């Protein structure tokens, strides 16, 4: 009986650990499902503002402190514009033009940019494993985002015929997703500065609300009634992306982070695009080319190498010390 109870506890802990990544991945699919009936900026607005209200209500219930000075509010506003307005705005624009699974892979490549920014701003050491991950990441994103024809022309030693008009790179969903990923990376770098002055959960709630307001204004300028064509299924998709994909996912993530599971969480980042790819294929029947699948594989390996570079370095050092250990004959 005790063994069974321990097994159930381990299963619940494991499910809780992967829950945020499952919710974030499937939320991308839910957002994609409603974009045909409304504008990208309205979807981004609904993803942010109601979720921010829910997070703040929970924070109030936990008696977490509100911002106390204008310096704290200043950091929240900056965080909101970068990680709220720009990130969700670019994401929704990109999602309208590309698949949910592919978009999620590009979005979750942001540890690549975070590593470079941290190296530049905080003098963090990337190391050999990190640089290998960065190279794989750049290659993976190139395979995902650039036209397949470019690579086939290079393979056959032909000159590149680049078309920047129409549906080419300049207006591609992959480019918007890359901008979203860069915005998220800058937002990630801002988090330590925000957390020093404001409770992180409270900052998350306010940044969702403040970041959503410019998106709401743009959505209403584009269409005075952007909700009029959304059916019951579409509202269900939006509710899922808002409640589960934002409020609950962030709540679980912060709960796990407060318990000291940051290493486990960072090592599971690659699960978000895997869930998004799986459900976009299952529900939306999205298909990728062979080169794009290769790019997905490169990018996922890159995310793992960058997030786990310190742990991998220790493991490789231990293996090397065992290999070099002299054999003592009796």
UniProtKB/Swiss-Prot annotation:
The lineage of its organism: Bacteria, Bacillati, Cyanobacteriota, Cyanophyceae, Synechococcales. The keyword Cell membrane applies. Keywords: Cell membrane, Membrane, Repeat, Transmembrane, Transmembrane helix, Transport. The keyword Lyase does not apply. The chain crosses the membrane at residues 15-35, 41-61, 72-92, 102-122, 125-145, 175-195, 201-221, 238-258, 264-284, 286-306. Belongs to the EamA transporter family. Residues 22-146, 182-308 form the EamA domain. This is Uncharacterized transporter sll0355. It is a multi-pass membrane protein. Gene3D superfamilies: 1.10.3730.20. It comes from Synechocystis sp. (strain ATCC 27184 / PCC 6803 / Kazusa). Coiled coil: none annotated. PANTHER family: EAMA DOMAIN-CONTAINING PROTEIN, INNER MEMBRANE TRANSPORTER. SUPFAM superfamilies: Multidrug resistance efflux transporter EmrE (SSF103481). It comes from the Bacteria. It is found in: Cell membrane. One of its GO terms (cellular component) is plasma membrane.
